[in-house]
C-alpha cells in the first residue's frame, strides 16, 4: 500500500490500480481517462454509496447533496470511462456458500423449482435451519464470519452492536447538522413502522406531530446510504411497476435483514432460531423478501387499496406482473384469496406464495419454501431483434420508383 498527499493506492501487477475511498480524493479521479487510454492498467476505485449518490464536501467541509449533474463538478469522470458496480451484503445463496453448501445441493433446489417437485426431506429440513440462521445473522460479512468461525450468537450480537454504533456515528458525521436528529429518528422508527398492521410509512409515527416536510430528506439520506429501501404502493396490479408506483405512499424495510433483527435487540436472535417469533414474525419475513429483492438489484413494490386489499410484493417475473405473498407459517391472506378469485378484474394469471411449505402447485398458485426466494430469476427477458434487410428494401424502393 502506498500513500501520497492525495490518496492511498495499491499497485497490483496482475490487476491494476486500486484506489480506496475515491470520493475523499476528487482531483486524482480526473486522471482515470488518461490511465485507461494508456492501456497498461485497470483501475478499481472503492467508495461509499453516499459518494456515488452525489454527497460531497462543500467549501465548509460539510457533507451535502449536490444537484444531479453537478456532484463533483470539474472533478467528475467523463462519461464512458466509469462503470459503477454496487456491492451488497451476502444474500442467502452466498450465506449457503459460506456454510460449505456446494453447487450440487443448490442444483437440487433449482431442479425442484424448475420441475415443481418437492425438495428431498433431509435437504428441506437443513435449508430451513440455515434460512433461520440467515434471518438471525443477516448478510454483513463480519457477522457471518463470527457465526462461521465461532458458532456463538453472542459474538454475532457483539458484531451487530458495533455495526449499529458505526451506522449511527456516520449519521452524525456525514449529514448536515439540520438533518442529523431527523435521520436518526427515521432510522430508529423502522421497527415500529413495520410492527403496525398497516405498514405504510407514516411520518407521525417517527415522532409525535412529525410531518414529511421535516423528514423526507433524512429518509432519502438513509436510502442513499443503502441502509433502508422504500417499497412503493402500486395503484394497479400491472406493468410497468415503476410507472404505476405512488411516490408518497410506501413502506420502509432495512436493506439487510440482519439490521432489522439487530434493531429489535434483546433475545430476538435466539427467538428466531427457536421459532418463537411472536407477533413480529410477519414483519421479519416480509423484510427477508425485501432483502432478497434488493440484493437482486430490484426496486420494491406492493399493492394496497383503501378497502384493505393488500399484496405483500409485486414483481416482474417471466414477463408478467406476479404478486408475492410471504408467510412465516402455513397460511393464506384474505386479500390473496380475493384477488385469485377475480383474475379478470386484476389481470393476474400467476401467484407465488412463500412460507413453511415444500414445493407445490394449486392451479395458478405456486407455493415455495421461503428458502427458495433467492432462486427467482428476475433478470430481464432477453429480446433479440430480427435484422431488417435493407438490401431488399432498396430493391423494393427501386421497383416502385421505376413504375412511376
Model-derived regions: residue spans:
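Conserved P-loop NTPase "ATPase switch" module shared by AAA+ and STAND
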Residues: 1, 8-22, 26-28
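Conserved catalytic/switch belt of AAA+ P-loop NTPases
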Residues: 28-51
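Short glycine-/polar-rich loops that comprise or flank the Walker A/P-loop
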Residues: 39-41, 78-83, 298, 347-350
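Interdomain motor-coupling "hinge/lid" segment immediately C-terminal to the ATP-binding subdomain
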Residues: 47, 53-195
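Accessory nucleic acid-recognition modules appended to NTPase machines
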Residues: 133, 140, 145-311, 315-318
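Structural motif
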Residues: 320-322, 350
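Catalytic cores of nucleic-acid endonucleases
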Residues: 328-371
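Domain-level recognition of nuclease-like catalytic cores that cleave nucleotide substrates
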Residues: 358-404
Amino acid at each position: 500500500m502506498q500513500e501520497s498527499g492525495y490518496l492511498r493506492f495499491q499497485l497490483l501487477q496482475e490487476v491494476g490500480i486500486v484506489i480506496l475511498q475515491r470520493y475523499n480524493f476528487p482531483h486524482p479521479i480526473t486522471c482515470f481517462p488518461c490511465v485507461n487510454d494508456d492501456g497498461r492498467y485497470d483501475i478499481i476505485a472503492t467508495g461509499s454509496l453516499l459518494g456515488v449518490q452525489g454527497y460531497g464536501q462543500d467549501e465548509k467541509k460539510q457533507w451535502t447533496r449536490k444537484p444531479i449533474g453537478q456532484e463533483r463538478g470539474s472533478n467528475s469522470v467523463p462519461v464512458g470511462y466509469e462503470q459503477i458496480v454496487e456491492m451488497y451484503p451476502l444474500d442467502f445463496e452466498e450465506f449457503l456458500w459460506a456454510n460449505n453448501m456446494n453447487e450440487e445441493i443448490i442444483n437440487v433446489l433449482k431442479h425442484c423449482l424448475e420441475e415443481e417437485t418437492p425438495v428431498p426431506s433431509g435437504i428441506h429440513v437443513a435449508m430451513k435451519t440455515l434460512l433461520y440462521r440467515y434471518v438471525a445473522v443477516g448478510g454483513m460479512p463480519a457477522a457471518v464470519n463470527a457465526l462461521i468461525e465461532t458458532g456463538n450468537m453472542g459474538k454475532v450480537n457483539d458484531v451487530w452492536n458495533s455495526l449499529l454504533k458505526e451506522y449511527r456515528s456516520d449519521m452524525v458525521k456525514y449529514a448536515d447538522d439540520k438533518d442529523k436528529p431527523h435521520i436518526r429518528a427515521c432510522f430508529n422508527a423502522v421497527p415500529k413502522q413495520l410492527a403496525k398492521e398497516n405498514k405504510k410509512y407514516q411520518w407521525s409515527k417517527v415522532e409525535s406531530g412529525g410531518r414529511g416536510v421535516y423528514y423526507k430528506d433524512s429518509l432519502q439520506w438513509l436510502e442513499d446510504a443503502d441502509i433502508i429501501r422504500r417499497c412503493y404502493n402500486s395503484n394497479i396490479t400491472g406493468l410497468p411497476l415503476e410507472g404505476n408506483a405512488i411516490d408518497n405512499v410506501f413502506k420502509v424495510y432495512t436493506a439487510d435483514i440482519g439490521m432489522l433483527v439487530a434493531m429489535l435487540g434483546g433475545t430476538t436472535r435466539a427467538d428466531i432460531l427457536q421459532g418463537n417469533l411472536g407477533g413480529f414474525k410477519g414483519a421479519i419475513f416480509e423484510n427477508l423478501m425485501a432483502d432478497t429483492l434488493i440484493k437482486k438489484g430490484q426496486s420494491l413494490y406492493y399493492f394496497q387499496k383503501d378497502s384493505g386489499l393488500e399484496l405483500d410484493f409485486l414483481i416482474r417475473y417471466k414477463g408478467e406482473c406476479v404478486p408475492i405473498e410471504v408467510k412465516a407459517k402455513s397460511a393464506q391472506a384474505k386479500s390473496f384469496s380475493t384477488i385469485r378469485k377475480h383474475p379478470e378484474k386484476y389481470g393476474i394469471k400467476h401467484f407465488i406464495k412463500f412460507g413453511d411449505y415444500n414445493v407445490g402447485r394449486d392451479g395458478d398458485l405456486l407455493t415455495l419454501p421461503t428458502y427458495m426466494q433467492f432462486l427467482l430469476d428476475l433478470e430481464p427477458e432477453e429480446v433479440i431483434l430480427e435484422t431488417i434487410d435493407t438490401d431488399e428494401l432498396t430493391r423494393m424502393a427501386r421497383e416502385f420508383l421505376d413504375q412511376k
